[in-house]
Amino acid sequence: MTPKIDILIFGAHPDDIELGCGGTILSEIENGKTVGLVDLTAGELGTRGSAEKRKQETDKASKILGVDFRLNLGMKDGFIKNDENSQYEIIKLIRKYQPDIIICNAPDDRHIDHAEASKLVVSASFLSGLVKIRTEIDNNIQNRWRPKNVYHYIPVSYTHLTLPTIC
């Protein structure tokens, strides 16, 4: 049986999670929380680097952060869709790991994959709690599960605040 985790974090691409909430991950792990990461794509369309290089970087980052696991769903970079098939993939993971908290990309990000990934994860988080949606893994029917909270991260590089601005 898969152990329940406290926080499940989704990113459209490898590196989205670290850039968007790496500090939060470290803090939560230091506070004893269990954390799993899920990249939706391999980032194969990225301008800088390659899917292979990003895989190496995410493996290293995951080890440094001390997360419990990291998965890649292999969705097509640039073409993430909030459709039924994609929702079922996410629902199965939510039901498998039963997180209390889910964190994902910001819904209004200008990058189409980030915005669509956010909508996908939010939709699946709701649907995972519906008893009439049936899912199974390895021929075992999954129980419904809805996380208590869904939060969004915004990479700090997207903000233009300085200390005097916020004080």
Residue ranges, per PLM feature:
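Conserved acidic residues
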Residues: 68, 100, 148, 160
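Single conserved hydrophobic/aromatic residue that forms the stacking wall/gate
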Residues: 160-167
